[in-house]
Every structure is written in C-alpha cells, then in structure tokens.
C-alpha cells in the first residue's frame, strides 16, 4: 500500500484539496446582543440565537454553571476533578476563561465542597462590581467560598447554617435562603472578610407555599416565584435586605383553569422593558414545577404587576402545534430588540417528542423568528451582567 501511494504522480497529490477541520478565531470583546450559553454536564457551548450560529465551547469539570464579569472579559467556572475520573482525591477550582478566546487563563483553588447541582441559579454569583465571586458549598453543611477575582485567590469561607444557595446583593453582600423561610445576608469588606451575618425571618412559608430557587435579578430586586405562582420580591437596594409586597402571576380565573408555573428555568427578564416572562402550563395537579414543561409564556409589567400578553410556544413552520412534552426553559437575550428563547431537551412522548430544539421569538411582540434544531444541551445563560 505504501509503495502504491509513492507511485502516484506528484501532480495528483498537489491537486488534492484538503478540508480544514474548523476555524480558530477570536470573539469580539463585547458580547453580542443575542449570544446565549448552553451549559450542561461537562461542557458549555456558545451560540448566537439571532443567526442560530455556533460560536464555540469550553470543556468543564462537572456541571457547567458560569458567572460572567461585568466588563465581559472573563468567564468564571467552578469545576470539580477526581484523580481517578469518578473517584479518588477531589479537587475543586474556579477556572478563569478569557471570554474572547474561550481559553483558560488562570485557576483558583477553592475548598473541595462546592455544591454540584443542576439548577442554573444559586450555585455561584458575582458582586455587581465584579470584585468578588461566591460559590455555594454543600457537604451537607452549607457555606460560601468567597473568591477575590482581582487577586485570583480565595478570600475566605463562611458558614451559612440552615441556609442554602447564593445570590449577589450589590458590591459587598450575598443573600441565601434558609430552610425556615428566612433570608441570610452575608456582608464582607474590601478584602473579602466577613463583616456580619444577618438573618431575617418571614420571607416565605416553606410549608404552605415554598419558592423555587430559580430567581431572576431585576435592578435591586431578586424575584422568586412560589409553587402557587406568587412573586416574592427581595429588595437588596438599601443597606439592609427588605421584603417587598408579594404579588400573583395568576388571577382567580387562571387558578380555576389550573394554570401553574412550569419547567426548570421558568422566569426570564426583559430588563430594558421592565417585563417578567413566566413559563406556564395548564394541568390539574399542582406538582413540583420542574416535573412539567411549559406550553405558554406569560408576560408581566413588573411595575404594574399585571399580565400584558401571552405567547404560545408553537413553531408555525412545523404546523403550529406545541410539541408533546412542551418546553423546559426560557431566556431573554439583551439589546434593544431582545429575543425570547424556549428550549426543550426532547425525549417526550408522542410524535416529535424526541427532538431537542429552541424556539426563538421577538420578545417585545411575540412574533416567531425561527427554530434552532438540535441545540447543545444544558441550561441557558446570557453572557451579560446588565443588572
């Protein structure tokens, strides 16, 4: 075989055209308005939802749960590694990726106890000024690892007994939800050292109507939704965390018709328009929201606390029917003309139930744009921090 190859005329070899195996490029310093990350187990992939174009990916140790620097330069990714792959000595780090090249530029050692969870919200967050990153730990004791992003080092680990998850609250505070319905606020100084921990009772009733951890941040409010569709607003604008008055996503008529929140990412924001988007479904049982996917998105004016429109999750090019199983996650992109994304993982019952896809709509008027077929797996993240 080798001799036969050597006998080929040189002109034949020279004329052969070889395909490249991919394009290596550098992304713009400023994230595109419609860029969205699909973050799943072991990988996070970046796409442009407007063009349905694939932009790149990063490999991750464990579940990918990114946090983005406010200036858009870096992606912070907590990772977990074992010396024998699935066993052995455990090492936890925060890897710092350059957001333009998607290459790792540094890693920061953290306590080997970070919570590995599927929820896209509550495992890691970054302060509004980008100075400190907090990683939620679960062993089952709970604590927060605080990382100084400028020094690229661990500033400290602080216990949050009886509480879980982490949500940034300005430049030097983080809040966590507690098992009895209280909220714990951790305040730190400019070196990342603990200044105080304040526990405030009565944010919610975990027995009567618990909230999901999948909150969204709108300016100085964290908006949580309960299983019954009540919005619990956590005000972080002042020096002390405060509880705003609760309001309902559903009217009495909606409740009588058995409408409920749905999916694994059931809230999204159009920050420029001050609108909250909720993924909902109509079903007789009021189960855990994650156990059912959504068929509609309802849009609310946050200031007026009222619904303004409904968007059916249907692809008119595919016959206008909502696929069996519905949609699991929603996200709103940035910019003056934001897009609404509705993602489904596939595998549902009935015709077409096995095909993953993302429906893309114009968020402001609900008009359909296109469908992204066979998208990367994972939760949805927008690489901007325009809080």
Kindly label every feature range from the protein language model.
Residues 49-51, 99-101, 148-152, 188-191, ...:
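Short loop/turn segments that connect beta-strands within beta-propeller blades
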Residues 18-31, 61-79, 116-126, 161-173, ...:
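Beta-rich, blade/repeat-based domains predominating
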Residues 16-19, 51-58, 62-64, 103-115, ...:
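A short beta-strand motif characteristic of beta-propeller blades
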């Amino acid at each position: 075989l080798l001799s036969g190859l050597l006998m080929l005329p040189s002109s034949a070899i020279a004329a052969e055209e070889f395909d490249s195996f991919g394009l290596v490029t550098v992304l713009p310093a400023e994230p595109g308005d419609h860029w969205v990350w699909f973050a799943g187990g072991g990988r996070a992939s970046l796409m442009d939802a407007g063009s349905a174009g694939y932009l790149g990916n990063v490999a991750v140790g464990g579940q990918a749960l990114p946090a983005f620097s406010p200036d858009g330069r870096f992606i912070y990714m907590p990772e977990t590694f074992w010396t024998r792959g699935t066993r052995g000595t455990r090492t936890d780090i925060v890897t710092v990726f350059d957001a333009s090249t998607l290459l790792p530029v540094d890693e920061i050692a953290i306590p080997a106890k970070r919570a590995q969870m599927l929820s896209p919200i509550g495992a890691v967050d970054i302060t509004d000024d980008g100075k400190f990153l907090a990683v939620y730990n679960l062993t089952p004791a709970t604590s927060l690892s605080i990382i100084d992003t400028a020094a690229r080092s661990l500033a400290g680990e602080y216990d949050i007994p009886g509480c879980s998850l982490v949500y940034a609250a300005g430049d030097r505070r983080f809040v966590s939800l507690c098992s009895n319905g209280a909220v714990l606020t951790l305040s730190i100084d400019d070196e990342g050292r603990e200044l105080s921990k304040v526990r405030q009772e009565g944010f919610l009733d975990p027995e009567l109507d618990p909230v999901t951890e999948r909150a969204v941040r709108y300016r100085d409010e964290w908006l949580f939704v309960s299983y019954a569709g009540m919005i619990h607003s956590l005000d972080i604008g002042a020096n002390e965390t405060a509880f705003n008055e609760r309001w309902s996503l559903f009217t009495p008529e909606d409740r009588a018709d058995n409408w409920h929140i749905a999916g694994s990412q059931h809230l999204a924001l159009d920050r420029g328009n001050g609108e909250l988007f909720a993924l909902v479904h109509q079903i007789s049982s009021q189960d855990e929201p994650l156990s059912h996917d959504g068929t509609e998105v309802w849009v609310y004016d946050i200031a007026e606390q009222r619904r303004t429109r409904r968007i059916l999750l249907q692809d008119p090019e595919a016959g206008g029917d909502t696929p069996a199983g519905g949609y699991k996650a929603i996200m709103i992109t940035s910019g003056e003309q934001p897009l609404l994304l509705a993602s489904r993982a596939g595998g549902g019952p009935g015709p077409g139930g096995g095909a993953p896809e993302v429906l893309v709509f114009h968020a402001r008027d609900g008009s359909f744009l296109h469908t992204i077929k066979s998208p990367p797996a994972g939760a949805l993240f927008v690489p901007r921090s325009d809080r």
